[in-house]
Amino acid sequence: MKKKIKVIKIGDVYTESHSRMIKEANLWKDSVVADDLFLPYRNLLFLTIASAFAQSIGVGTVYSAFINSNHAKEIDCSLEFFMKLRKLLQEYGSVEVVFPYRNYTKTDVARLGISLTVPIDSTYSCQVNPEIPCGVCPNCVDRLVAINNVMRGYIKND
């Protein structure tokens, strides 16, 4: 049975936020530091909404693609946070949240994507632009470094 992806708008939660993820920054011109891109409890919202929706339609597992990145210091990106949330959701509901890529680095993900012939040029994880990678936010820089690392490995092996 084929399932459709359901889009749930949660943007209204952050209408008063000063985060540059909401009030879009021009990272080529503006002076923006990583803290300016922080949205409090963003991942908590994503995972609890996905879990609530899953439980309401009888789906028992939610998959998350969080990886082990340098952003793991943020309170709702840490392994401890994910494990506590997972336990809470299992104890008070019927949904399990699974993190199959949690121990992957961005380079590991790029390597996997290339090995699966994913069109890497169509991927992005931009913190600022929802349509095309900005190329300068921390996630875009990490992505470019990861792809570069993988490609260097392929060149060495030829």
Task: Please provide the spans of the model-predicted regions.
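Glycine-rich nucleotide phosphate-binding loop and flanking beta-alpha elements
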Residues: N70, I147-N148
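ATP-dependent adenylation/nucleotidyltransferase module used to activate substrates
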Residues: M1-T117
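Short linear functional motifs in flexible/disordered or boundary regions
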Residues: V62, E74, V97, S125, ...
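Local cysteine-cluster metal-coordination motifs and their immediate loop/turn environment
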Residues: L44, T48, S122-V145
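Short cysteine/histidine-rich metal-coordination sites, predominantly Zn2+-binding motifs
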Residues: N129-P130, M151-D158
